[in-house]
Structures are given as C-alpha cells and as structure tokens.
C-alpha cells in the first residue's frame, strides 16, 4: 500500500464526508485537497482536466478517478484490505438491503430533498436562489418528502445496533451523511429511534475523524458554533 496513490478532493459538505468515512474505516492513508463547492476551485483548468463535471467530491486511486460519492464509497470498501470491524455483505439479501438504504439516501433524501432545498433557499440562508430562483413551494415539497422518507424507514432502525447488525456498513455511511445535513438545515427529526441511532453513531472514532477531515471539527455542534 506504500506505493498506492489515494487522494480525495472535497471539503465542508456531506458528500465528500461519505468517502472520508469509508477511508477511515479501511484504515487507509490518503491525501486530501480541501477545496469547496462553488468557490471557483472546481472550475480551474487543472481541476476540470481530472474532473470535467467541475464538482466535488472527486476520489482517486492510482489511475482511477471516481466523481460520484456513492460510487467512490463503494469502491473504497470493496477494493482494499477488508476491515474486521466494518460489515461487507456476502448474501444477495444483505447486498440488496444496503443498496436500498444507499439509493434511498442518495435519491430521496439527498437529491429530491436536501439539494432541492439548497437550490431554492435564499443566499443569506446558504441557498442558491441567486442561480435557480426562489421557490417556496418546491422547498416545502422537498422537506415533506424528507420527513416522509424518515417516517418510512423508522421501522428499520435498530434499537441498539447499526443498520445491518453489530458492525457499520455503507448503509450507515449514507444514512448518517444525510442525517447530519438535515441537522445543518434545521429539519426536525422527530423519531426517537432515529435520534438514538444518530447519537450512538457519532461516537464512533472513524466517524469523528471523518468529521474532522470534512468539517475541521469532530462534532456537528462544534462546526455550527464555529461558523455562526
């Protein structure tokens, strides 16, 4: 592994966080480039040459570049030496359940929820309405969809363990990445089961290190306090 090139571009958003957490779980050494979204850093000639999408995150392993966070997360956990403390599915059922969590988080909560809200929120509230326009109805519908998805998955949240059992998996990386951004957006999570799961998860050392790599702080509360 000493000759491997492992790099990640991305900072201060929940999508790069997914890759950072996977890297920490696999105990890998990597180099990170702390570039932000819509700061101009993703539009340089040098960056566009390796990622024509002009977005973050971007993951590199030697000559392989992956520009979607879910794909990069999956690559990291499946390609390198396995961790004894991270769950990788061996049965079709468990693979499908992890995929179900991942797709629900990526599509329903992230794309159709969080990102729609960000696109149409006012700039002073961290939104992009200067680009996409204000759309209160779209924000309301996106928030309703998030709440509906949380209500739907509540029955599958364990009382004590991780989503797939005694070890965390990619399902947890995806779900926690979404829960953290919901808290950043001040979307109330009413489910005691989900809140208890969140409180357990944030204590994991690999999660904390991924938070530091992504947000410079080990907890969301510290990050919010520093950025107020």
Region annotations inferred by a language model:
Residues 1-136, 228:
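GST-like domain detector, emphasizing the conserved glutathione-binding G-site
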Residues 7, 17-22, 31-34, 38, ...:
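Domain-wide signal for the mature, well-folded portions of proteins, strongly enriched
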Residues 41-43, 201, 220-221:
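Short Asp/Glu-rich motifs
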Residues 105-200:
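GST-like fold's C-terminal all-alpha helical module
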Residues 213-228:
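Acidic/histidine-enriched, glycine/proline-rich intrinsically disordered or flexible terminal extensions
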């Amino acid at each position: 592994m000493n000759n491997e090139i492992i790099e990640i571009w991305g900072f201060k958003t929940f999508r790069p966080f997914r890759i950072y957490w996977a890297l920490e779980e696999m105990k890998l050494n990597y180099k990170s480039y702390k570039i932000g979204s819509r700061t101009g850093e993703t539009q340089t000639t040098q960056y566009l040459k390796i990622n024509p999408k002009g977005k973050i995150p971007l993951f590199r392993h030697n000559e392989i570049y992956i520009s979607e966070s879910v794909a990069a997360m999956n690559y990291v956990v499946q390609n390198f030496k396995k961790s004894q403390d991270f769950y990788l599915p061996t049965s079709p059922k468990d693979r499908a359940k992890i995929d179900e969590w991942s797709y629900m988080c990526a599509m329903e909560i992230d794309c159709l929820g969080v990102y729609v809200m960000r696109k149409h929120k006012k700039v002073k509230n961290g939104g992009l309405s200067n680009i996409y326009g204000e759309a209160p109805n779209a924000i309301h519908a996106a928030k309703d969809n998030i709440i509906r998805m949380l209500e739907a998955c509540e029955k599958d949240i364990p009382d004590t363990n991780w989503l797939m059992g005694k070890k965390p998996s990619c399902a947890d990386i995806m779900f926690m990445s979404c829960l953290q951004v919901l808290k950043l957006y001040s979307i109330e999570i009413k489910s005691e089961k989900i809140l208890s799961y969140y409180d357990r998860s944030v204590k994991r050392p690999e999660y904390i290190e991924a938070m530091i790599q992504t947000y410079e702080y080990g907890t969301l509360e510290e990050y919010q306090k520093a950025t107020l």
